[in-house]
């Protein structure tokens, strides 16, 4: 007997990211991870970024000071966050 159950590829977190609203034009990657509550503090941000565990727009990023702009997507630990302008 064949299995006719529909199988779907798992959705990547980047397909439905949560929003990270920022007031300025740019934010540094380490700050964004903290603001999005993806890490506890700057030390944790440094460790996970330097270990290559964080992706920006689908590419591994190892620079904590990487500047993110509106529209950039951060992925870490199964979560995705999109940098967007804050409502004024």
Model region roles, listed by residue range:
Residues 1-35, 60-63, 67-88:
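Ferredoxin-like alpha/beta domains used as RNA- or RNAP-binding modules
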Residues 48-49, 68:
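Short, well-ordered loop/turn sites that connect or cap secondary structure elements
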């Amino acid at each position: 007997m064949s299995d006719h159950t529909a199988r779907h590829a798992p959705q990547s977190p980047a397909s439905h990211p949560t929003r990270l609203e920022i007031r300025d034009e740019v934010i540094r990657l380490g700050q964004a991870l903290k603001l999005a509550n993806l890490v506890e503090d700057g030390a944790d941000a440094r460790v996970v970024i330097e270990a290559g565990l964080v992706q920006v727009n689908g590419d591994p990023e190892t620079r904590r000071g990487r500047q993110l702009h509106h529209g950039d997507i951060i992925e870490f630990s199964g979560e995705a966050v999109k940098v967007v302008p804050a409502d004024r």
